[in-house]
């Protein structure tokens, strides 16, 4: 399913089940933080029932965002975000491909280690984001190979990485992460493909 339901019971919210249009398991905490800020700022005038619908329809750009059926981008670009990402990938699904890139000034080796330790994708596809800060794809690929025995493909262009993932996936999901730049580039490429279609 492509949503998360969670509940909270309090004098303010009553016994309410909330639903988020997102599969990121870290999003209920973010939603509750926003709800508490709303309660603090607006008190009884906040209308929690209206916010329930807002949360159900809300989409967080770049946070486990489904950009094509079965294709997700997540801006996870640090260790805590990658940890949250690994906990959000459904363990009961058939298979998936991970597309990854990172910038040079991030702790990408720890991020790669965490991905490889916690996930078992069909394949990792590593690429280079087209920015001076982008880490070399071959370097990232060699780090992945230190931590996993899963197939690792190194493709220099984000477009080639995405097209390869789409061609290889069959009915499997694709998750793209490691950099906000990568998230933006993937979304841009998908927009181009949709415009050209």
Language-model regions, residue ranges each:
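Extended acidic/charged loop-beta regions that coordinate divalent cations
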Residues: 1-17
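C-terminal helical cap/extension that packs against the catalytic core
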Residues: 2-4, 70, 112-173
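Nucleotide phosphate-binding/pyrophosphate-handling subdomain across enzymes
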Residues: 12-123
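Short SAM/SAH-binding signature in class I
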Residues: 33, 169-178, 182
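Active-site catalytic pocket residues across diverse enzymes, especially alpha/beta-hydrolases
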Residues: 41-42, 89, 119, 144, ...
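Short glycine-/acidic-enriched loop or helix-start segments at secondary-structure transitions
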Residues: 82-83, 108-110, 136-137, 185-188
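Glycine-rich beta-strand-to-loop/alpha-helix junction loops that act as flexible
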Residues: 100-102, 129, 177-180
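Glycine/aspartate-rich loop-and-adjacent alpha/beta segment that forms the canonical ThDP
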Residues: 179-197
């Amino acid at each position: 399913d492509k949503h998360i339901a969670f509940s909270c019971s309090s004098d303010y919210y009553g016994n309410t089940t909330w639903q988020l249009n997102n599969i990121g398991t870290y999003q209920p905490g973010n939603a509750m933080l926003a709800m508490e800020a709303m309660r603090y700022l607006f008190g009884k005038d906040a209308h929690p029932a209206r916010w329930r619908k807002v949360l159900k329809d809300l989409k967080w750009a770049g946070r486990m965002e489904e950009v094509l059926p079965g294709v997700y981008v997540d801006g996870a670009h640090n260790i805590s975000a990658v940890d949250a990402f690994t906990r959000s990938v459904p363990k009961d699904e058939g298979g998936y491909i991970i597309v990854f890139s990172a910038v040079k000034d991030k702790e990408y080796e720890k991020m790669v280690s965490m991905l490889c330790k916690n996930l078992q994708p069909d394949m990792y596809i590593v690429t280079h984001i087209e920015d001076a800060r982008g880490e070399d794809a071959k370097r990232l690929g060699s780090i992945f190979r230190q931590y996993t025995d899963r197939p690792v493909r190194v493709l220099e262009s984000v477009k080639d990485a995405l097209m390869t993932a789409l061609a290889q996936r069959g009915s499997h999901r694709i998750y793209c992460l490691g950099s906000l730049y990568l998230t933006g580039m993937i979304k841009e490429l998908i927009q181009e493909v949709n415009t050209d279609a």
